């Protein structure tokens, strides 16, 4: 089973990168590929740009990567209560290649933040919009106060309750 894990941030030190990678490796027998949002850099989407530039290679490559997956894990960073600009822009361009961005594949949405909110707002946005992008949502989990529950030196969750929720 091939698992595609994506952290929806451009930060190389993203806590959502750590969470997506950790969660993907919990799938027994899974082959994991972690996608870097920076590999799909695109100009700001607009209809005018789409008319002049057409479908861009990075958006097509993103759709093609998701086609390879048997399951997808997306860990969402929250900026001002919603998606990061880079992730929203990628969704906008990718949805022009194929409205069915997630291609009816099983998707788990995760979100975390350093604070007690756990990026719950962006998680709600993702789950609510998932049907529009043809995601077969199998679960979602917000993890508040990430640094209180994750050991950076071992790259492991230290909270057994949260770990159990992820495994489910």
Model-derived regions: residue spans:
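Short, glycine-/small-residue-rich phosphate/pyrophosphate-handling segment
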Residues: 103-145
